[in-house]
């Protein structure tokens, strides 16, 4: 899916995102993550093979939500994305340092020197909804 500009702006504005994956028993597992874009894929980085990554390796279905500021018809704006994720090895320090420029401050770094290469989650967007300028 080609992401609308309004969604791209929300995803790159430094709002914390809630990443929902599915545990083996079908229950939700929720993590707060920093997000960015790689083309039309949403990306987030992780130093270790956390439960959320193991969940994605078993079941690629994910949901991502974030509050985006502003109001529409008196309601707080929020963005919800449903999609499928895949995990790649390596690149976590570079992506986290890039995202630190948005989430912490210009010139900031996050990954310690010599950090393990970790993993990147790539989310292909299948459905966009919520309250805001992206509402279908």
Whereabouts are the PLM-identified features?
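Extreme N-terminal tail/first-helix region
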Residues: 1-16
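Charged, gly/pro-rich active-site loop segments
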Residues: 1-2, 73-136
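A generic local structural motif
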Residues: 3-6, 29-31, 49-51, 108-109
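Short coil-to-beta transition motif at edge beta-strands of beta-rich domains
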Residues: 59-61
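A solvent-exposed, acidic/Ser-Thr-rich amphipathic alpha-helical stretch
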Residues: 40-41, 53, 72-75
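Short beta-strand segments
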Residues: 14-48, 64-67, 78
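Amphipathic alpha-helical interface surfaces
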Residues: 7, 49-52, 92-95, 99
């Amino acid at each position: 899916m080609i992401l609308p500009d309004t969604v791209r702006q929300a995803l790159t504005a430094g709002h914390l995102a809630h990443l929902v994956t599915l545990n083996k028993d079908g229950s939700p597992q929720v993590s707060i993550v920093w997000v960015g874009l790689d083309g039309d894929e949403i990306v987030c980085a992780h130093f270790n093979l956390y439960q959320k990554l193991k969940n994605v390796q078993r079941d690629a279905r994910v949901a991502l939500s974030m509050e985006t500021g502003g109001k529409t018809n008196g309601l707080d704006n929020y963005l919800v994305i449903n999609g499928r994720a895949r995990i790649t090895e390596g690149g976590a320090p570079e992506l986290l340092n890039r995202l630190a420029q948005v989430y912490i401050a210009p010139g900031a770094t996050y990954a310690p020197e010599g950090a393990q290469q970790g993993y990147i989650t790539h989310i292909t967007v299948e459905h966009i909804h919520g309250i805001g300028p992206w509402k279908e």
